[in-house]
Amino acid sequence: MQKRLSGKCKICKQPYIKQKATQQVCSVECAVKWSAEQSRKKREKLDKQARAESKKRLSALKEENKTKGQLIKEVQEAVNRYIRVRDENKECISCGTPLISEKLGGGFDAGHYRSRGAAPHLRFYTLNIHGQCKRCNRHLGGNYHEYRVGLIERLGIKKVEEIEADQRQRHYSNDDLRRIKRIFNKKTRLIQRKRG
């Protein structure tokens, strides 16, 4: 003789004897309510998937329609973030002040030896960019002469002269800019993970 299974109704929470092993509710009225509930949950799930897919399509479309200027700005932000993480707890390239990171506004800047205006082709070149205190970078116009002295100490005179003589044009496509941004974001995350 087969033992009858007992269950608890999913709708009214009353105990009942199951007629089938897959039975979920105790009566026809509860079955109608349970069916409506399941339909509602299925609709909500499909709506959520549709919204997620729509959001993904919209963000891809926004990324695709960015202008070159917007992409350059985003890449510059990624490069500067990398420089700040790389040079954290080092000394300012110009004056030797310790570079301590601050949460609000950042404790120091990513200063360019050859400025972005004078040498836009070197704006993403990491040997041209070093951690610099805000005083030197903003208030002393980059403190160029001291920056050069600090750069010679770090890289050597030959490399500094190569940077000064570099006039090669670099023309970046939108895909190149997106790739550069991904690379620098990845480098930043790697350094942050190593530091913990």
Which residues does each PLM region occupy?
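Histidine-centered nuclease catalytic patch
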Residues: 93-129
